[in-house]
């Protein structure tokens, strides 16, 4: 069984807690793209955990976690993340964590370049997390990066790194007028943070292929959402990798295999971190009330998330490009006690009603067409079956399910690990 858990919207949908919940039924959890530019928040009996690089299955005993070839890894951040989890009693060893030798290393100069470019763009910025993600993916396709497997022989790639740094300084020093990168310091950085990771680095493609042949259950964990995918998202306000489910087996390291199911995750309302069009955004007091109720601040950056009503148009599109066979709806409990709940059912562009998700500048001109639903004035966090939910909540879910066209199989009604309804 090969399953993917992917974001339907702009990211921050709650994928981490769904992975944590479902990973009990899987042998392996694999991240397949992205870096430490997003955070997956998981709450369990040991506390609250924010994972930037490690797969969310690391919090489950007996689950093997794989960091795939499609990832870009800041090794300094990873060493720190492993250390912080160990301090909270989480066991991490080569038995439950395996890192692809083909994964790309995000270097300190990638972070520097990211910050310099975002500052240069000023009010035209893309909303980067400043973690170096776009520069490292760009360098990957320029074939000017270091990979995790290279950490086994840093002396052997020293001249290659020096050549890369010389090339990189043409931009850093010549273009941005910043102090040049010191290649020897970069080599020291690789040795310092690479050494503790060596036991985890292996041929994960071979490992996953063998596991699949043996009938092991593998769960692929996406970072960000469909609308941040480099090809199918709201370009250029996207990430720099493919976050869609179709890329999961490729990025993980088993491109010869295909998914059996794709579980799309979306919130019961809309949130967005970063720049770009966000049609159903709520402003002022209305938006602030929802933001505070949902504690909507980026797990990786701490930035306040933009919030809005549920967007049927964007979510239907996201579910389609993700090939979603089922939906997990998160944070339904946050909408408790609202008098009226807005749902964006269509867009209006240049005076015309539009039901399909547009691309390019048309999205900038879109206005939301709302329908309003009655709220429910009660706590639903103890509900563990669909029938226990208030009628207004059930009506809200049924409407969304009908409009999206995919079954809502999982519904989260609280932050705790078991606060999920399975239909």
Question: How does the language model describe each region?
Answer:
Residues 1-423:
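Non-transmembrane, aqueous-exposed alpha-helical and coiled segments at domain scale
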């Amino acid at each position: 069984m090969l399953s993917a858990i992917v974001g339907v919207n702009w990211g921050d949908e709650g994928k981490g807690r769904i992975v944590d919940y479902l990973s009990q039924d899987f042998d392996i959890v694999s991240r397949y793209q992205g870096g430490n530019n997003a955070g997956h928040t998981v709450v369990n009996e040991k506390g609250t955990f924010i994972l930037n690089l490690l797969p969310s299955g690391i919090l489950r005993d007996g689950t093997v976690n794989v960091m795939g070839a499609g990832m870009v890894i800041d090794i300094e951040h990873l060493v720190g993340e492993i250390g912080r989890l160990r301090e909270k009693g989480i066991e991490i060893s080569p038995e439950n964590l395996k890192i692809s030798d083909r994964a790309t290393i995000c270097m300190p100069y990638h972070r520097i370049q990211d910050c310099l470019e975002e500052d240069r763009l000023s009010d035209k910025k893309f909303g980067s997390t400043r973690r170096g993600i776009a520069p490292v993916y760009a360098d990957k396709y320029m074939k000017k990066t270091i990979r995790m497997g290279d950490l086994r022989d840093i002396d052997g790639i020293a001249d290659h790194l020096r050549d890369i740094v010389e090339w990189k300084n043409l931009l850093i020093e010549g273009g941005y007028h910043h102090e040049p990168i010191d290649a020897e310091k970069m080599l020291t950085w690789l040795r310092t943070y690479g050494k503790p990771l060596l036991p985890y680095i292996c041929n994960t493609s071979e490992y996953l292929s063998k596991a699949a042949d043996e009938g092991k259950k593998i769960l692929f964990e996406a970072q960000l959402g469909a609308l941040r995918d480099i090809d199918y998202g709201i370009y250029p306000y996207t990430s720099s990798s493919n976050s869609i489910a179709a890329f999961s087996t490729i990025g993980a390291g088993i491109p010869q295999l295909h998914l059996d199911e794709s579980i799309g995750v979306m919130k019961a309302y809309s949130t967005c971190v970063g720049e770009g069009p966000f049609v159903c955004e709520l402003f002022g007091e209305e938006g602030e009330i929802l933001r505070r109720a949902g504690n909507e601040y980026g797990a990786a950056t701490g930035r306040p998330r933009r919030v809005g009503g549920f967007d049927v148009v964007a979510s239907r599109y996201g579910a389609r490009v993700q090939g979603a066979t089922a939906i997990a709806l998160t944070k339904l409990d946050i909408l408790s006690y609202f008098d009226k709940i807005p749902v964006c059912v269509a867009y209006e562009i240049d005076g015309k009603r539009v039901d399909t998700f547009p691309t390019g500048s048309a999205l900038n001109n879109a206005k939301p067409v709302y329908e309003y639903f009655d709220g429910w004035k009660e706590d639903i966090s103890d509900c563990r079956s669909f029938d226990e939910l208030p009628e207004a909540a059930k009506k809200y879910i049924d409407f969304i399910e009908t409009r999206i066209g995919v079954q809502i199989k999982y519904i989260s009604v609280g932050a705790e690990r078991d606060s999920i309804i399975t239909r």
